[in-house]
Amino acid sequence: MDKVFILGGLRSYIGVRNSAYRHVPAEHLGAAVLKELTARYQPSKIDMIICGNCVGGGGNITRLMALEAGLSESIPSVTVDLQCASSLEAVITAAARIQSGLADLRCV
């Protein structure tokens, strides 16, 4: 099995009730994170984007984030919605795909 390394980490603001970001759609918050990550790493090396989101209104919010961040339409995007465990499951999914040889670089 391939070894998996976390190359860096960023987090979006939390748009909860009474916060300054409560009216900002989640895809805008996520797109800001993706833009910064792709400024640090080569976007052409990313073979999939996996994002955990527990307050989405349905649909593939990760796809919206990727497109808004200016990433290629050819990069598949997956949204994981497991209340309270979405982000951890996104990391586990990415790591498992890398270990199995199905992927090289995942943006989570």
Where does each model-flagged region fall?
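Conserved "HGTGT" condensation-loop signature of ketosynthase/thiolase-family condensing enzymes
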Residues: 1-75
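Residues that mark the start of a beta-strand
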Residues: 3, 104-105
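Conserved catalytic cysteine-centered active-site region
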Residues: 53-104
